[in-house]
Amino acid sequence: MAEASAAGADSGAAVAAHRFFCHFCKGEVSPKLPEYICPRCESGFIEEVTDDSSFLGGGGSRIDNTTTTHFAELWGHLDHTMFFQDFRPFLSSSPLDQDNRANERGHQTHTDFWGARPPRLPLGRRYRSRGSSRPDRSPAIEGILQHIFAGFFANSAIPGSPHPFSWSGMLHSNPGDYAWGQTGLDAIVTQLLGQLENTGPPPADKEKITSLPTVTVTQEQVDMGLECPVCKEDYTVEEEVRQLPCNHFFHSSCIVPWLELHDTCPVCRKSLNGEDSTRQSQSTEASASNRFSNDSQLHDRWTF
């Protein structure tokens, strides 16, 4: 019996001699035994510190291709408080705040959701580039994880719990409609510009352009300060200009290239037929907006 006690004491001393690092608290801790959980945040996301642990010193970097390492990297990219808002005391980056909030709320919330022990994450070596305070957040990885959690929490609620998980309370719409990072935002803007391209009035008919009357500028018009609306140059007496059906005057070299692209007056937006092209443009833009919305719903959000 005495020998067993001595052996247990030696084992405890050996464990105590080991150093452990908590990835939630971002510091060394002495884990609670035998569960191996952090005494500050009550999480199991800790690992043993070795001489080559990359998160404690500077130098090169190493990569571990094990499954547990991949999960640890994904978990590190994830903004935990976005999903577990009721567990902010346990996921806060400040150990003092964690201790204070945990004392105020007690362990009732903790035990209601997870039982007597907190959720344990797979323990494995976790490496990232040394000299960096935290890993770079990947929009693609974060989007995938949020989709996974969206499906997991969609219909989950703990009976009798005052805080059932609800994805609708975390985001204001479908997570797939969000732009994850700068890349996602650029893709949306590019698609929107593509939908709105060529939504203005179509080119004017060439016969109508050539049939526009050519008139000469009078002294009265010069005295009124009449100018070309395109180049803003003042007209001179007896200068030849082109007159549109809306009675606006332009230099031929200014208005013809415009009409070859848009059947509309640059001043009043009326077409050569005398119709108001503003309403046509609005209806075309609305149609393009609806097309963009439908395409967004059918877009494969897992392509990156």
From Swiss-Prot:
Changing C231A: Loss of autoubiquitination. The keyword Transcription regulation does not apply. A zinc finger (RING-type) spans 228-269. It is found in: Cytoplasm; Nucleus; Endoplasmic reticulum; Golgi apparatus. Changing K32R: Loss of autoubiquitination. Its main location: cytoplasm. This is E3 ubiquitin-protein ligase RNF115. It comes from Homo sapiens. The lineage of its organism: Eukaryota, Metazoa, Chordata, Craniata, Vertebrata. The gene is RNF115.
